[in-house]
Amino acid sequence: MRNKKIFIALFILASTLTFGQAKTAEIGFITDNDLYTSSKNDMYYTNGLELFYRFLSKNNNEKINKKITEFRIGQYIYNPRFINAEAVTINDRPFTGYLFAEAGRSFFYQSESVLKTDFQLGFMGPNALGKETQESFHHIIGYKEVFGWENQLHNAFAVQAHVMYSKKMFPSKYNDFIDLHFQSEANLGTIFTGVSTGFLTRIGFKKLLPIYDSNLHDASVSFQPQYNIREFYFYAMPSVNYQFYDATIQGSMFSNTSPLTFDLEPLRFNAEFGLKYRHNNFNMSYSFIYRGRELRDPETNTNSGYFYGSIRFGYLLK
């Protein structure tokens, strides 16, 4: 009996030490697909996959709670609404893929403001392997065959910069279960150039963590030991986007040899909402994302707003 009590005590102590250790890094993935919202949906931004690794960086600024460095690799795939053999000549968006590597740094302030910056290098076009990835994925899951990749956009080299700033609204009126943030971001590069602005709210099923400890903007890593951390909330983020340039629609800015391109619909309304959860070392989320109409297609006039789902999973490391 005594040995049993000792074993239980040691198990509890080991569990406490394991979950109470500082977690200074996180590894994980993000997968996007329109099938996560509807089995009948397979158009426009149709698939995305990102692998990430982030870690805490040295910080000597008293106004900054955390400084986080992050690396990612990812691939996005785009196709028109119709991908059957009979509709190869009916296109309301180009086929293309985008493959990239990314390095970024995030600054989480004591005021719960956030500044994120990142840079990408990569390729759009055949070098991005969108055709091979989509055809293999459809074959594996037994989904319909895709026709039309012979019309995909030609190669373009990607150099991208991105910045996002978020500011907590009404910081003096603290509430354990709801908050509101103003958020703006900008992209500049050879593939995407545009700006977005909007509002984001969290509604907690449990007491909300401060933004600099929350997984909302990927700040779960910490130098401080954390004990039995739980986070579970709904979030919503409506925004307005003005897109100046999009190579996945217009083709490369350095050539006009692609077989099929379109003019942009520059002003769009976008929305995102979902659930985010954390239990100790595990982060996970599901998001439903809506994108407004992105281009003008006078010949077919079928392009419209669309939606897709995003699933994220991360694991915190020592």
Language-model regions, residue ranges each:
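Transmembrane beta-strands of outer-membrane beta-barrel proteins
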Residues: 25-29, 69-73, 115-121, 161, ...
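Outer membrane beta-barrel transmembrane domains
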Residues: 37, 81-82, 206-318
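Outer-membrane pore/translocation modules
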Residues: 73-100, 106-216, 220-223, 245-263, ...
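Solvent-exposed loop/turn segments connecting transmembrane beta-strands
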Residues: 38-44, 112, 154, 184-196, ...
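Glycine- and aromatic-enriched membrane insertion/assembly motifs of diderm outer-membrane
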Residues: 51-80, 123, 280-284
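Feature captures outer-membrane beta-barrel proteins of Gram-negative bacteria and organelles
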Residues: 47-56, 161-167, 195-205, 271-277, ...
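Bacterial Sec-dependent N-terminal signal peptides
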Residues: 1-25, 313-317
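N-terminal ordered "arm"
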Residues: 22-66
